[in-house]
Curated annotation (Swiss-Prot):
Keyword flag Ligase: yes
EC number of the protein: 6.3.2.2
Family: Belongs to the glutamate--cysteine ligase type 2 family. YbdK subfamily.
Residue ranges that the Swiss-Prot or TrEMBL entry lists as coiled coil: none
Native source organism of the sequence: Legionella pneumophila (strain Corby)
InterPro entries the UniProt entry points to: GCL_type2/YbdK_subfam (IPR050141), GCS2 (IPR006336), Gln_synth/guanido_kin_cat_dom (IPR014746), YbdK (IPR011793)
SUPFAM superfamilies: Glutamine synthetase/guanido kinase (SSF55931)
Protein name stated in the entry: Putative glutamate--cysteine ligase 2-1
Catalytic activities: L-cysteine + L-glutamate + ATP = gamma-L-glutamyl-L-cysteine + ADP + phosphate + H(+)
Source organism phylogeny: Bacteria, Pseudomonadati, Pseudomonadota, Gammaproteobacteria, Legionellales
Length: 383
């Protein structure tokens, strides 16, 4: 079979998508207001970079393509500013976090687009249950073969990404005792989890065309894998991260993945084999459940290691790529978080323990969401 086309991208160019919670300013619950928000944004700058998601209590911002994490950060701040200015007119707030701590998925409303209505008819309750919030990170690849290699090679580091981004310990009003409960939600979808063991772009093209011919998929969006190729963009997309509480944390995560991807593409240190996937689900569980203190089984080591220790070792290993990309400031901050066993899940638990109040927790999350821009006049707080 002929190859699928793959749009050539600059090596490790970056882009991100961030899904945020739409919050009622009085009750601090999720509120289905994305239709109103999209109408209010109709004539705004960056309108095409702010999008609805499958349920109406979600909103997504999309960065453009960048080489620099700092430039991406500046753009995300501008997108945040537009959201806040628009929200003021319709009395809503926003926050990060992978889950809303006390929302009930049964109360969610599907956004009335053709695509989302079709997905709801296909997946029914799973669609509403997917009212959880993630950060997706795109990494540019020069070729389809590079994209397949990177998709597999990064699978070894998926526990890192879950652990450093974890921000969803509460779900449906309970303490799940998971650092990232969000990362367990999509397991029920078909074509979720890990990409099949396809070794190059030719094998992937053959697989894609068969799945299309068999009417299992219509397009690349029907694959819910943790990491998937996006040939129309010339990227691979990492989909396992919870939405962080702050924009800055989203940049730390992106900067780490960018440097790691450059190391992997330049040095090709990961030998692709089935062994990678023998331990994949177990390692993923460890990160979801225990975060930075989860145990990681590495196939070329005799005994498990802590995820946090593996992250710290990896940062040292890829230092030259971190420096070359200008990401040192962000990785130093991430290194400090990891060595001190800090992620957003830890912070959320700490805030909740102060008052035992979910509404106060959400109010704090709304404040944290704006903390990157605390010196800006347009900053507003939930009432």
């Amino acid at each position: 079979m002929r190859l699928l086309s793959f749009k050539k991208s600059k090596i490790v160019s970056i882009g991100t998508e961030l899904e945020f919670q739409i919050i009622d300013r009085s009750s601090l619950s999720l509120v289905s207001r994305s239709k109103e928000l999209m109408r209010a944004l109709k004539d705004m700058r960056y309108r095409d970079q702010i999008k609805p998601e499958i349920t109406q209590s979600m909103i997504e911002i999309n960065s453009s393509i960048h080489q620099s994490a700092k430039e991406m950060y500046d753009e995300l701040l501008e997108l945040q500013k537009i959201l806040v200015e628009t929200a003021a007119s319709i009395d809503i707030a926003f926050c990060g976090g992978g889950t809303h701590p006390f929302q009930q998925w049964t109360m969610q409303k599907i956004f009335p687009s053709k695509r989302f209505k079709k997905k709801f008819n296909q997946y029914r309750y799973l669609s509403k249950r997917a009212t959880v919030f993630g950060q997706h990170i795109h990494i540019g690849c020069p070729t389809g073969d590079d994209a397949i290699y990177l998709t597999h090679a990064l699978a070894r580091y998926v526990p890192h990404f879950i652990a450093i981004s974890a921000s969803s310990p509460f779900y449906l009003g309970i303490n799940t005792n998971y650092c990232s409960s969000r990362s367990t939600i999509f397991n029920a979808f078909p074509l979720s989890g890990v990409i099949p063991y396809l070794r190059n772009w030719q094998e992937f093209s053959d697989y894609y065309r068969k799945m299309y011919r068999w009417k299992i998929i219509e397009n690349m969006k029907d694959f819910y894998w943790d990491i998937r190729p996006k040939p129309e963009l010339g990227t691979i997309e990492i989909r396992v991260c919870d939405t962080p509480l702050t924009l800055r944390k989203s940049i730390l995560i992106t900067a780490y993945i960018q440097a790691l991807a450059l190391y992997l593409l330049k040095e090709k240190p990961v030998q692709l084999s089935h062994d990678l996937y023998y331990v994949y689900n177990y390692n993923r569980f460890q990160a979801s459940r225990h975060g930075l203190e989860g145990e990681l089984t590495v196939t070329d080591k005799d005994k498990p290691i802590l995820i946090m220790d593996d992250i710290l070792e990896t940062i040292k290993k890829i230092e030259q790529y971190i420096n070359g990309l200008g990401n040192s400031e962000y990785i130093e901050e991430l290194y400090s978080d990891v060595i001190n066993k800090q992620n957003d899940s830890v912070l959320i638990n700490k805030i909740y323990k102060q008052d035992g109040s979910f509404t106060k927790l959400v109010a704090a999350q709304c404040e944290l969401w704006l903390s990157d821009s605390k010196d800006r006049k347009w900053m507003t707080q939930p009432s």
